[in-house]
Amino acid sequence: MKIVIIFFIAMMAVGVYSKDGYLVKKNGCKYDCTPLFGDSNCNGECKAFKASWGSCYWFACYCRGLPDSVPTYPSSKTCSS
């Protein structure tokens, strides 16, 4: 029985950092990148927001393992330059 309880607690902890998506700025626009050179930049940007890693995908930074509080695309805000 203790194992079942520990399993559920562990699953809840993992779920906190399980959000994936395109990182957006405060103005609602995605973080831009260049596919051949942008992976290291995107990885740094995503990790700054507590993601597990990030990469450049379709000319925008895609993050894995973001906290639920970090806004991702599509954002409720529209992109305004």
Curated annotation (Swiss-Prot):
Signal peptide: 1-18
Residue ranges annotated for the LCN-type CS-alpha/beta domain, each copy included: 19-80
Tissue: Expressed by the venom gland.
Chief place where the protein resides: secreted
Source species, domain of life: Eukaryota
RNA-binding among keywords: no
Pfam families in the cross-refs: Toxin_3 (PF00537)
Similarity field: Belongs to the long (4 C-C) scorpion toxin superfamily. Sodium channel inhibitor family. Beta subfamily.
Protein function: Binds voltage-independently at site-4 of sodium channels (Nav) and shift the voltage of activation toward more negative potentials thereby affecting sodium channel activation and promoting spontaneous and repetitive firing.
Domain comment (free text): Has the structural arrangement of an alpha-helix connected to antiparallel beta-sheets by disulfide bonds (CS-alpha/beta).
Annotated protein name in UniProt: Neurotoxin LmNaTx11.1
